[in-house]
A protein has these predicted regions:
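C-terminal His-loop and adjacent cap/lid subdomain of alpha/beta-hydrolase
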Residues: 1-441
Length: 441
């Protein structure tokens, strides 16, 4: 297990990179950053075994290397506020800097602890041409960090999970500040979900650092165990295929482990995963949300606020991308996974998006997807929101589209504002009753 040091303070900015935009103290929480260092192990495919569609992959230790990285912690200040669940999120590095959800109201109001784990090389070194990794952003604070290769990311993630779990070393600096941890959940979104897919299929059979897994906006394919010196970048010129082909599902999640798994996908990932969909079981929940997409106008706006504060250079969002945030479903997944592990109450099964035999989504006369989880903005629409992209590039592909109805079209649907609000509220209440939305939404 890695050695913990901290809390970390100082640096050029005086705050942790990509910290929460919320005043967490007003929720009875505190923010603290720690470093963890030690020896990490890489893994390789066991000789003579097949890494096939069934996800029952066999891995074994390969090499070892020293590492040093960070974990950003949000925890209740009082034991009475803590529900016993720690969520460890695998920070996403697709943008060339770290992204993670530190603004979850379910976390802050529900009494969880959140640990944002930096486990990939690009998070520290950034991606060319504009390098905005931790060491470049604040060399004084983060200049000593080092992850030699993403090959070691899986074990680093395990070590971070163990360092905040119930059997952690209490004699060392404690990222949980003495809180009585009962369970640890692994969470990852997008590229990080792909890495967790590989972790679940190849590492979880012999490593019990995590009690449950939440994979959000997951494309249905695991990432490699070994990439060597490569800085993984989906925008590399080496990719000549279309985004849809590049991100198409390729494998299922293994079905022989006792840790529960929760998939929360938008319409976009539902399309990608069409060929590797799995039925709901006693250990798997698979949600698909119609009318949503990988990225929304709301998530882009939230990211821009963080980027402006932390003085980052970002890619301008395409106008007209999807306008229905899927974020509220992430909070619901936290709530349901916590109950699943703590009380044995499985999350509610939800309908899947309707597909033609060809793999195309069945759409209504307006072009809105049929089936699936139907948020109020889908069931009582003011626009046609979908995962259909406006342009062929990767960023447009992830953003889908939103086509607002004209004033005349709105009036043809709803007699007046009151009628619209009544219908919207009715669907929202139903979503709460079905366990799709939390009451606060």
């Amino acid at each position: 297990m890695g050695v913990i040091s901290g809390p970390v303070i100082g640096g050029n900015y005086g705050w942790p990179f990509a910290k929460s935009m919320l005043d967490v103290t007003s929720y009875g929480y505190e923010e603290a950053e720690y470093f963890i260092e030690g020896e990490a192990t890489s893994y390789r495919q066991v000789d003579g075994t097949e890494w096939g569609r069934d996800g029952k992959w066999q891995a074994e230790p390969d090499k070892s290397s020293p590492y040093k990285t960070r974990l950003l912690v949000y925890r209740p200040t009082e034991q009475e506020r803590f529900n016993g669940t720690v969520i460890v999120t695998w920070n996403n590095v697709t943008a060339g800097y770290e992204l993670f959800g530190a603004d979850s109201l379910e976390v802050l109001e529900g009494g969880y602890a959140l640990v944002c784990a930096s486990v990939q090389r690009a998070g520290i070194e950034g991606l060319p041409p504009v390098k905005q990794g931790l060491a470049d952003w604040d060399s004084e604070r983060y200049g000593s960090l080092n992850i030699p290769s993403d090959d070691f990311s899986y074990d680093i993630f395990s070590q971070i999970g163990s360092s905040v779990g119930p059997d952690r070393d209490f004699s060392a600096p404690d990222p949980m500040a003495g809180l009585q941890v009962k369970r640890v959940i692994a969470q990852g979104a997008s590229q990080s979900a792909g890495r967790l897919g590989t972790y679940f299929n190849a590492i979880a059979p012999f490593d019990r650092s995590f009690d449950g897994f939440i994979l959000s906006i997951y494309f249905g394919r695991g990432t490699p165990l070994q990439v060597g010196d490569e800085l993984v970048n989906i925008n590399n010129a080496q990719y000549n295929d279309s985004p849809a082909d590049r991100l198409r599902g390729a494998n299922v999640l293994r079905d022989d482990l006792d840790q529960p798994v929760f998939i929360v996908n938008s319409e976009l990932e539902a399309m990608a995963c069409y060929g590797v969909r799995q039925p709901d079981t006693s250990k798997l929940r698979w949600w698909e949300s119609a009318g949503t997409c990988h990225v929304s106008q709301q998530s882009r706006a939230a990211r821009k606020l963080m980027a402006d504060r932390d003085k980052l250079i970002t890619v301008d969002a395409n106008d007209g991308i999807n306008a229905i945030p899927i974020g509220p479903l992430y909070d619901s997944a936290f709530y349901h996974m916590h109950r699943w592990l703590s009380e044995g109450v499985a999350p509610p099964i939800q309908p899947r998006i309707d597909f033609e035999a060809s793999g195309s989504i069945v759409r209504d006369d307006d072009g809105i997807a049929k089936g699936g989880i139907r948020l109020p903005q889908v069931e009582v629409p003011l626009a046609i929101n979908s995962a259909i992209p406006l342009k062929p590039d990767i960023f447009a592909y992830l953003g889908g589209s939103s086509h607002p109805f004209s004033k005349e079209e709105v009036l043809a649907r709803y007699a007046d504002r009151s009628s619209f609000l009544k219908a919207f509220e009715s669907v929202a209440k139903l979503a709460v009753e079905e366990g799709v939305l939390m009451p606060r939404e």
